């Protein structure tokens, strides 16, 4: 009964707050950076369509970048953003960016795919890749996943030739028969399945290598505007819960979002996006980022990413590995959790 009363009061408080006639007159600007046609940026489109930013008192502008590197390099021009885990580490090391939540678990969708007459034989005996060539995008999350897969197959550095190229080039090479083994991330994984007849070989999930998407903030801006960060997170989490609970509507907004980004994938592929990339509600985020006396799960994940970046040279030899305690924080998730209005907002699925 007490829980029911608390929930009712929180809902009432939320309704009163969001119905405030002064809210629309006092919107606070938040500049969001993102990347187009990715699952982690779909919540931005949904929130805009639903008017949720304004409901919590935010006026947002969204700037899309073609990749993580230019996005992070331009970090002074935005306040919060969605990016990959590799640029999130680079942003922590060089631009004082803090990771405040994970967008989703992309471990199953950073993967190696095979095609051609030897595809089934390679799937049956992955060690037969020895002496072959793997095409992937170097210094990226799929590079990390591919390295973990090759190690699982018992292959050492130098057992295969790795050629680095962009994702579009890999898709073209596999579709034309000029490449048989490629490392890709979603939604490109679905494209090579459908256009090149490629088959799944291995992903980060198979090796226990977690590959998250990251929600990041400029540390100086966040320190001055903690409540704006909390409101941003509350909207994002609500959008994710809505997408998870309303598949038909989720597919429709995903299609609109991907169309704007110039990516066309089938409905089956869009369903795979949701089915293979777990997201986290507020309680799940808090569990991932809970440090206590031991490093958090998020700490361990980001340490793995940072060590990989050091290995491949994305972090310079003179750069120390960034300590997660200095840039991975649950401070703003806790603000959401402690605020009855924001917590109720974040936990809604409609």
Regions found by a protein language model. Give the residues of each.
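Conserved C-terminal helix/tail region of periplasmic/extracytoplasmic solute-binding proteins
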Residues: 301-350
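Pocket-lining segment of extracytoplasmic ligand-binding domains
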Residues: 118, 169-267
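Structured segments of extracytoplasmic/periplasmic soluble domains
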Residues: 47-50, 56, 132, 137, ...
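Secondary-structure end/capping motifs
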Residues: 225-316
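Short, glycine-/small- and polar/acidic-enriched structural segments
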Residues: 25-166, 171-173, 180-186, 201-203, ...
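Sec/Tat signal peptide C-region and signal peptidase I cleavage site
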Residues: 20-24
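N-terminal secretory signal peptides that target proteins for export/translocation
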Residues: 1-4
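Hydrophobic helical h-region of N-terminal Sec-dependent signal peptides
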Residues: 6-18
